[in-house]
Amino acid sequence: MTYGEAVADVLEFGQSEGEPIGMAPEEWRAFAARASLHAARAKAKELGADPPWDCELAKTPEGYYQIRGGIPYAIAKSLAAAPFADILWMETKTADLADARQFAEAIHAEFPDQMLAYNLSPSFNWDTTGMTDEEMRRFPEELGKMGFVFNFITYGGHQIDGVAAEEFATALRQDGMLALARLQRKMRLVESPYRTPQTLVGGPRSDAALAASSGRTATTKAMGKGSTQHQHLVQTEVPRKLLEEWLAMWSGHYQLKDKLRVQLRPQRAGSEVLELGIHGESDDKLANVIFQPIQDRRGRTILLVRDQNTFGAELRQKRLMTLIHLWLVHRFKAQAVHYVTPTDDNLYQTSKMKSHGIFTEVNQEVGEIIVAEVNHPRIAELLTPDRVALRKLITKEA
């Protein structure tokens, strides 16, 4: 029993006996919810309702005072600290928007501009919260609407480092240095600054310090011409610039003003599903293909196309998607393209690409999928440096 509850019991007993109590129990509870123990005890003595209550007797062997935790306690403590705090943080046992809202509304009722913090804790098992995937995705956004301006994960970095190291060590044991090559490919794909490691570990700064301390007479540098970092600047994959050059030819033929830009990224961070997007000068997304490169049991590379869109009606029926598919097949060395849950547009497109010689076979009778086999001799013809065949494809001469 808290001191406030003990006093409330005394007041209720006195009230039931018809004694003058000086303050209604409900009024006392409202006062005690915000008052310190010293202020509450002084008020209780003033009311003649100071019960025998000793917080020292309930201390734990370690010396901790016992409290009744919960949202009301967190609110009371935070309201007391609010005049002196830049930001307030309430720790919870699980992720719950209702709890967060109760706390936020109580604080903002008295301090409307008070900033709040929320721990998106890895201690929570987020799959036991009862939230759907979409609710989890929007959870930080909903917190922001309540005034939680600082949302953090206490030891997320520790877990990320642990899982990444564990996965990489296991991959090294299973696949040798192919594991590192795959990691480097991913870093190049997302254009991570970690792909040039010497820069991030302080190579340029070390060289600058050495030059300064030696009066610029030092001849040994970490970042000289022989630095292994320069290996990571070599273009090892088919560049996006190639598709941008094709799109420039395409735009010129159709007299389109936008200079088109190509972006290739994971559809969502960490996902194996990729998105190739075509953007205009205003950064509007004009077209995209969502796909995943996989290998079958025979080691053949297959592009699984999950979705594709041409967002501007003026860009359709101009073989834009054909150019995009040509580049994807070239970039990922695909032997086949599979369209999952295909649309009528996919049916039309694959039949046309077969007529252009890009596909040798198109099977549309394999459940909810279209299987298209790539015609590599035709692909090689379209990729010749003179671009004669490619230009004819763009201009519909052949």
Curated annotation (Swiss-Prot):
Tell me which InterPro entries the record gives. Isocitrate_lyase, Pyrv/PenolPyrv_kinase-like_dom, Pyrv_kinase-like_dom_sf
Q: Which GO biological process annotations does it have?
A: carboxylic acid metabolic process
Say which domain of life the source belongs to.
Answer: Bacteria
* Record field: catalytic activity: D-threo-isocitrate = glyoxylate + succinate
Cofactor dependence is on:
Mg(2+)
Provide the alphabetized UniProt keywords.
Lyase
Name a GO molecular-function annotation.
isocitrate lyase activity
Q: What is its EC number?
A: 4.1.3.1
Which top class of enzyme applies to this chain? Answer: lyase
Instruction: Briefly state the protein's biological role.
Output: Together with AceAa, they could catalyze the formation of succinate and glyoxylate from isocitrate.
Name the family the entry cites. Belongs to the isocitrate lyase/PEP mutase superfamily. Isocitrate lyase family.
- Descriptive protein name: Putative isocitrate lyase subunit B
Q: Which organism is it from?
A: Mycobacterium tuberculosis (strain ATCC 25618 / H37Rv)
Q: Which gene encodes it?
A: aceAb
